[in-house]
């Protein structure tokens, strides 16, 4: 929606970002305006982290503001759960911090933390905000309470990391490909058609009581499937063991061709 000139750098590639910053710096020198670098704190599909320490280090060479979408990092990353910026020790160098109430806060809605003048500008000029409804009071009160819990009950976050590490290490030990995640987001990469992927997800939900989301082409290459698991602090190590076993079972069935490669699930039979 922005009319601004856009430069795209290769995912998490700092040399690519540097080149784009050089181009952007030359551009704004002739047109005026400023530079805004945008990244995720935790990338929602693969679970890897944006290199916020390396990005903010470039501020010593280039004049730009940094916007971090930390939907998956807020509440889980950093010593106090303040997010990926805190994890890297550069939270004070993030100019616009975006978070959501829909992940760690188990609600809905979102927020932007920034300087007051920028916040006021967004409030009155951002298209998605102009005619939006306010959050309901129960949601606001619930978010405040959950924020208090995040701050006063660090054991919940510690339990979450225990569960996440157990799940990820267990999946890898059983030969599962979970990519390069180093966050709570736990992707499991499999090979198969979209139809097979739909049946795997259906099988997990109906026969193993495991709900997970599926990501298919064009988000990932054709012939690949990404099943995304999100552990919580309410899960137990027994849940983890059960999940690992279930994924091993469906992966074996997929490899044997037991899921139909072409026919989609007949919704009338669900």
Regions from the language model: what does each represent?
Residues 62-65, 72, 77-182, 189, ...:
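Active-site C-terminal subdomain of aminotransferase-like
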Residues 130, 206-211, 247-255:
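A common structural junction motif
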Residues 26, 254-270:
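Eukaryotic N-terminal low-complexity, Ser/Thr- and Lys/Arg-rich leader segments
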Residues 10-14, 27, 31, 35-39, ...:
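Pyridoxal 5′-phosphate
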Residues 7, 11-67:
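Active-site phosphate-binding strand-loop segment of PLP-dependent enzymes
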Residues 14-15, 41-46, 73-76, 129-130, ...:
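Short, small-residue-enriched loops and turns at beta-alpha junctions
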Residues 153, 157-208, 217-224, 231-233, ...:
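Conserved PLP-binding catalytic core of the aspartate aminotransferase-like
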């Amino acid at each position: 929606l922005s009319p601004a000139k856009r430069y795209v750098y290769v995912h998490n590639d700092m040399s690519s970002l540097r080149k784009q910053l050089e181009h952007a710096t030359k551009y704004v020198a002739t047109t005026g305006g400023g530079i805004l670098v945008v990244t995720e704190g935790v990338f929602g599909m693969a679970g890897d982290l944006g290199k916020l320490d390396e990005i903010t280090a470039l501020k010593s060479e280039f004049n730009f503001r940094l916007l971090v979408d930390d939907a998956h990092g807020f509440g889980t990353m950093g010593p106090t759960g303040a997010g990926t910026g805190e994890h890297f020790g550069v939270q004070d160098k993030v100019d616009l911090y975006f978070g959501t109430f829909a992940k760690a806060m188990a609600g809905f809605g979102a927020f932007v933390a920034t300087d007051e003048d920028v916040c006021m500008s967004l409030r009155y000029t951002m298209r998605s905000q102009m005619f939006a409804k306010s959050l309901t009071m129960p949601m606001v009160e619930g978010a405040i309470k959950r924020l208090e819990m995040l701050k006063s009950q660090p054991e919940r976050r510690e339990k979450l990391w225990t569960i996440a590490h157990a799940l990820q290490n267990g999946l890898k030990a059983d030969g599962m490909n979970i990519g390069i995640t180093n966050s709570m987001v736990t992707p499991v990469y499999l090979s198969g058609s979209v139809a097979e992927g739909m049946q795997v997800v259906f099988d997990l939900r109906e026969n193993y009581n495991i709900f997970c989301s599926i990501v298919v082409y064009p988000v990932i290459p054709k012939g690949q499937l990404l099943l995304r698991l999100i552990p919580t602090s309410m899960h137990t190590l027994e849940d983890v063991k059960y999940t690992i076993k279930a994924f091993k079972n469906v992966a074996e069935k997929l490899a044997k061709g037991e899921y139909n490669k072409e026919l989609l699930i007949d919704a009338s039979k669900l």
